[in-house]
Every structure is written in C-alpha cells, then in structure tokens.
C-alpha cells in the first residue's frame, strides 16, 4: 500500500551565517533578514519550521543549509524526514549531512508533479513541456525574470518585464522563513500564471501529498 505524506520545500537557510542580516541587503539598502543576531535568526527559522512540519512529514531543503560545518547540528532539531538538494555552499561530505538527519542527498530532484527542484535556477531549455516549473533557491529576494511583447487587441504596445512563470523561488526570504507546503507552492504558481497570462497546467497530488 502506498503511504502518503505531507511535503514541504524551503531553501537557503544559511544557518549560522554570521552577520548575514547586515551582509544581505535589498536594493534600497534595507536588511534582507530582519534579525539582530545569528542566534535569533537560527532560532526563528527552527521554531517556524517545527510549528508547521511534523515528524512524519517530508521536507526538501534546496541547498545552502549552513555555511559553517559546526552549525549542521542545528538540523537535528528540525522536524520531518529531511531530503537535501545540494547548493553551492553545501560542500561537506554526504556522511556529514546524513549524521544530522538528511535521509537523501541529490543534485536535482524531479517530480511527477512536473516540478524540478534545484538550488540554482536551471537553464530554460531544461524547463520544457515535460517539466514545466523549476522550484529553486539561490536568489534570496530576487526572481528569474522574463521580457515579453505585450499585445492588446492584436497590437504590440511595448515590452513587459515580469517574473518568469516557469520558475518559483522558495528562499527563506520569500517564504517568511517558513517551509512551504506543496499546496502553497501550487497556489503561488497558479497565481503567477494568472498574473502573467500563462496557461500551462500544474498536476499536483491531492492535499499536497505524494508517494513517500
């Protein structure tokens, strides 16, 4: 019998990243992370994770979990069956991640939901009809953008630059430092498709669940 579980996704915790609230800035100079200490940042993300994720749930971490190896121990305090898709800062040995609770470690993970999970956004040629949405990290507060021709009543009225509907960034800065349930992922994708006039369907498991 197939067992179904709730699934969540999140990226770029940077647990233990010293002074990251000072180093990471928005374009207007305001802080990207609203914390005043590394400990506050770590504890806030762990608390929000555990408030949403239960032990039997599955969580996909899309890379850059920690910068300093010693902070990997914090992962032990986070609920759920943990799966890592490596990012550019996940440079330690597989066994180091397994020791703190990651059951699987991947480069890119592909789902029947037609999501591709990755750390760095993939080249558009990889996000084809077969895999229509790249759920990714790495960009923090930014998004993959596209420029298209705007048409009104058959006439070109100019160019529009907007978030690319085939990409969704799930970095902590864009998820309120909380994992997103797969239902929430689909809702965000559908809203973006509505906003941009994109019509490709997303197939998802009922209630954000899927085969374990």
Task: Explain the meaning of each model-derived region.
Residues 1-62, 66-212:
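Extended recognition/assembly regions associated with phosphoester-bond processing machinery
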